[in-house]
Amino acid sequence: MLTKIPLAALLLLAASPLCAQNGWFQPSLLAKPEVHKALQSVDDRASDIVEEWIRLVETPAPSGKEQARAKYIRAEMEKLGLSEIRTDDIFNVSGVRKGTGGGPTVVFAAHMDTVFPEGTDLKVKREGDILRGPGIGDDTSNLMATLEMFRALDRGGVKTGGDLIFLASVQEEVGLLGARHWLETSGYRPDMFVAIDISSTEVWYGALRIDQFKFFYTSPGAHTLESRGAPSPAKAVAKAINALYEIPLPPIAEGFGSFKLPTINVGMLGGGTVANAIPREAWFTVDLRSLDSATQDRLESAVVSTARRIGEQEGVGFRLERKMGIDYSKALPQKERLHHPLVQTALATSNYFRKPGTPEIAAKDAGANDSNIAVSMAIPAVAVGAVLEHMPHRLEEYAEASSMVPGIKSLIALAVALTSH
């Protein structure tokens, strides 16, 4: 049975000066013989890790079709001797590395899916330290790092007080569906949740408001020869998309790096069956992202009313489907999340192992990954990264191979600190 550590006790620890600075991490932890051995083993396997990383990248895993990767990860969990290994009905794979007892239970989650459809050329190209290929970073690099972290703990003979759960999730890229399903149905209620799903230059402890919609316009249709002046769903889609991008947005929030928030994005559109007819139906999707609920609610109202108005103007039918929305009404208050020892520990370990010459990492009250679901359930959560990755969600995506080893070491330090304090 998984141990639940009272939140009040965790927050009391967070109030101490030592915890406020480094959370539960102290560099002396790395000098323990078993931890040192685990860290050294990562150095010894550096080239093999990169080769396996490349093989994982070249294994297709579009959202909803992660079965090949799931099979591989499950087999590796079995080799590790994890307990309670499960592949659920949507192909999330999880396993538990049992602790000695008395410590918190912590989930380390990396998602298996990528945004790239079947048929994408996934061949990885090497250019010195640079690895180029779709999915090389998001999130295959972190999946590889998490797997290797669990292996290294075993190689070092590291014992943790609490249980460590390895969750390889699915469908993160299409609404965090895998993490939601696992947290709602697995029967586990972890004390803390760590998503390994960003670049190693970041630590996120919050959750963006993310809402996704699919808008449909419909009509009876008509042959091209009868189309002049007739209501057209295609025309409505074109006008609606243009109108949505004309909606005034608040100033870009500062302090979030490349994030330009709030934002409206049309990511998909389609409709029709032949070239020589008005389509009976045409559709497009909208992804809204904001830092706060008030801004998001105003954007949602503006987007929905604009899309509906265009339908009325064009004389076509209109309907919408909400594809994603997360209720954060139960989330812990911002200050409690920021000052939780989990966040401070993640900051300390990430900064300890960060690339020399790079800026100090600061925690951001944001998030667009599996940790969002944990945040919404009042589970202390954070998102970290293991690798320096660049241009995610693009065919030109690339990552720095040499960043993998220190990234894995950072995860080892984080896992031991969180479960053995």
Question: Each PLM stretch: what is its role?
Answer:
Residues 50-104, 123:
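A non-catalytic alpha/beta surface segment that caps or lines the substrate-entry region
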Residues 234-274, 319-321, 328-386:
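Active-site-adjacent substrate-binding region
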Residues 130, 135, 139-216, 256-257, ...:
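Acidic/histidine-rich catalytic neighborhood of metal-dependent amide-processing enzymes
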Residues 22-26, 30, 227-269, 277, ...:
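Acidic-enriched catalytic cores of C-N bond-cleaving enzymes acting on peptides and small amides
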Residues 25-30, 269, 356-418:
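Zn-dependent metallopeptidase/amidohydrolase metal-coordination segment
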Residues 20-62, 207-209:
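N-terminal hydrophobic or amphipathic helices/low-complexity stretches enriched
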Residues 22, 235-239, 243-246, 294, ...:
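His/Asp/Glu-rich mid-to-C-terminal helical/loop segments that flank catalytic regions of hydrolases
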Residues 96-141, 194:
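Catalytic-core environment of secreted peptidases
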